[in-house]
């Protein structure tokens, strides 16, 4: 169906309208591909033991020239679906970089759980929207200054990943005056 819509767009004489509709179709394709990719990995990936501190370090290393601080010399072995945890971290780090200039990650190992916090100095999110951002296709109000395209699935998928590992995510005001994402996983 999307291919047929794309073909029909070529016949629209109003180029501005055609371009806007084409962007909508591209966004829809991106959304569907993102969800299908998540659903496929979720059903096929097996749990494994891995060093979650190393996973965080490797994830951060792809963000060259970004001010991200993560100081962890301790090896923390976690059992879970590594690629899904990486995807979750990517979603939150991408958002932190998108809205802030400085990002600080921390990891703490408790007796029964593991806590990962991601803080940024961006504009944050209003407390009344904390629960809504985890709903599929939810987009934060345009007044937040988001000029970049978003499908509205990243936070929902990240939440599903953490919940599938028996954990939870909480949003809070960051000490950097932006947003803090607190991920808690059973250990």
Please annotate each region the language model reported.
Residues 166-167:
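Conserved glycine-rich
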Residues 69-80, 108:
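Conserved catalytic submotifs in the C-terminal HATPase_c
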Residues 120:
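Acidic ATP/Mg2+-coordinating residue in the GHKL
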Residues 125-138:
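Short conserved segment of the HATPase_c
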Residues 17-65:
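Conserved DHp (HisKA) dimerization/phosphotransfer helix of two-component histidine kinases, i.e.
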Residues 102-112:
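Short beta-strand/loop element within the Bergerat-fold HATPase_c
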